[in-house]
């Protein structure tokens, strides 16, 4: 029976970041993952390569571990930009509740001429495939900030695996313990102590951080019906993000510097075949806050529940938003 202050479930980059923040504060931390070390190291090696100047958490992490990146130039289609600018301006006159209860596709059909709508449809890749599942409010927030033509973009020249490896080495110097091939099958909580059980062992901790997917979260019997309802406010879409949502030339590792996009792509180089999106018709700000306070000593920070699943910066932000609560719980465990 292993006893630790904090257990992190999930040895992905979000789990590593969570462990990093906790270890830097002097807490005793262990990371548990059901995969082997080799499988984890082979996973997501080409992910999260493009980011913009507003992604401060990610940039700070890259700088801390001396990860190399450079400016990345994007060339946007002027007609598309003009249509998007028109949509954004018109949306300012629409109540937020209305924007939140309809898909972006439906909203655009209601305010655009047929000609302008076709420009958008033809220049946003897989437009109706994804934007019919994204609320107008969420889409407008992303289009006016994260993938805006006015943003300054960067691209990693180092493999993301370099960051993961350096974080792992650093965590080991902080005496963080790694338990691979270890699947948490059951979670119970009693007297503000959390028990995380595997097939052969039980981890006891003051704090449990779950940096795992929605599918894996819902396997735990700990969750009540209402809690499951909260977690089901995101839906999984089987989308080949690598082929639809990325700059396809990013696959050519050494042909990046000279490439200019001639369409407005969602700049999201993630090698996933599925993506979680917030359901429209709900206020995900309120839902995220409820998930944050779902338990007293268990915290959920998987990227499915971040503000936006398209960029890793927001997954880190999800953890940062619960970090002060973790510190408080560690100082006042009972």
Regions found by a protein language model. Give the residues of each.
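Beta1/beta-strand and adjacent pyrophosphate-binding region of the FAD-binding site
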Residues: 2-14
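Conserved Rossmann-like nucleotide-cofactor binding loop
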Residues: 14, 37, 215
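A short, Lys/Arg-enriched amphipathic alpha-helix followed by its capping loop at the start of a domain
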Residues: 17-27, 64, 174
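Glycine-rich FAD pyrophosphate-binding loop
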Residues: 23-43
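Dinucleotide-binding Rossmann-like beta1-alpha1 core, especially the glycine-rich loop
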Residues: 44-98
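Conserved flavin/dinucleotide-binding core of flavoenzymes
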Residues: 25, 238-242, 246-334
């Amino acid at each position: 029976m292993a006893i630790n202050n904090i257990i992190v479930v999930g040895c992905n980059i979000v789990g590593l970041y969570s462990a990093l923040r906790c270890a830097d504060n002097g807490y005793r931390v262990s990371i548990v993952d059901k995969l082997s070390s080799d499988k984890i190291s082979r996973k997501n090696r080409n992910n999260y390569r493009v980011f913009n100047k507003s992604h401060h958490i990610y940039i700070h992490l890259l700088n801390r571990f001396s990860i190399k990146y450079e400016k990345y130039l994007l060339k946007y289609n002027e007609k598309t930009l003009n249509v998007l600018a028109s949509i954004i301006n018109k949306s300012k006159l629409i109540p937020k509740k209305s924007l939140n209860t309809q898909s972006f596709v439906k909203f655009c059909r209601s305010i655009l001429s047929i000609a302008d709508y076709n420009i958008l449809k033809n220049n946003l890749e897989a437009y109706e495939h994804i934007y019919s599942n994204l609320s107008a409010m969420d889409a407008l927030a992303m289009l006016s900030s994260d993938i805006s033509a006015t943003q300054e973009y960067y691209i990693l020249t180092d493999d993301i695996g370099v960051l993961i490896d350096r974080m792992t080495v650093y965590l080991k110097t902080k005496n963080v313990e790694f338990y691979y091939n270890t699947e948490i099958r059951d979670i119970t909580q009693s007297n503000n102590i959390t028990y995380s059980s595997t097939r052969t062992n039980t981890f006891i901790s003051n704090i449990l951080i779950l940096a795992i997917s929605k599918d894996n979260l819902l396997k735990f019997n700990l969750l009540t019906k209402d809690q499951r309802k909260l977690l089901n406010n995101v839906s999984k879409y089987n989308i080949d993000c690598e082929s639809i949502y990325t700059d396809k030339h990013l696959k050519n590792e050494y042909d990046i510097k000279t490439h200019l996009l001639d369409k407005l792509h969602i700049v999201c180089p993630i090698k996933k075949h599925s993506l979680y999106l917030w359901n429209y018709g709900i206020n995900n700000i309120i839902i995220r806050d409820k998930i944050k306070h779902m338990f007293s000593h268990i915290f959920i920070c998987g990227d499915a529940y971040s503000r936006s699943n398209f960029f890793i910066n927001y997954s880190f932000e999800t953890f940062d938003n619960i970090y002060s609560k973790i510190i408080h719980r560690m100082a006042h465990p009972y």
